[in-house]
Amino acid sequence: MSKVIHVTSNEELDKYLQHQRVVVDFSAEWCGPCRAIAPVFDKLSNEFTTFTFVHVDIDKVNTHPIVKEIRSVPTFYFYVNGAKVSEFSGANEATLRSTLEANI
């Protein structure tokens, strides 16, 4: 069962960014690579239980200042104690996994 939280508002996103360890998947419904990496993101949410996994559809939550920074999808941001510690763009499972491992 997926532990991914699907954020639908700026307020929700702000709340989850304050968790101890967070990975945010910024994506869009129309994005093929986003759809391809989604099952991997779901699977990793069960493996890396110390992280809060958050999904943000940039077309639905599009007024948040962080979302306005996104230039390509999928983009993943990693936060520890409210501070961004890493990011990358692209549907790359190995990079996603290694970045999670580096921030445990």
From Swiss-Prot:
Site (Deprotonates C-terminal active site Cys): D25
GO cellular component, one term: extracellular matrix
Gene Ontology molecular-function annotations: disulfide oxidoreductase activity; protein disulfide isomerase activity; protein-disulfide reductase activity
Keywords: Disulfide bond, Electron transport, Redox-active center, Transport
Alphabetized Pfam families for the sequence: Thioredoxin (PF00085)
Cystine pairings recorded for this chain: C31-C34
All copies of domain Thioredoxin, residue ranges: 2-104
Site, Contributes to redox potential value: residue positions: G32, P33
Catalytic residues (positions): C31, C34
Family: Belongs to the thioredoxin family.
Entry function: Participates in various redox reactions through the reversible oxidation of its active center dithiol to a disulfide and catalyzes dithiol-disulfide exchange reactions.
Protein name according to UniProt: Thioredoxin-3
Record organism: Dictyostelium discoideum (Social amoeba)
Lineage of the species this protein comes from: Eukaryota, Amoebozoa, Evosea, Eumycetozoa, Dictyostelia
Originating gene: trxC
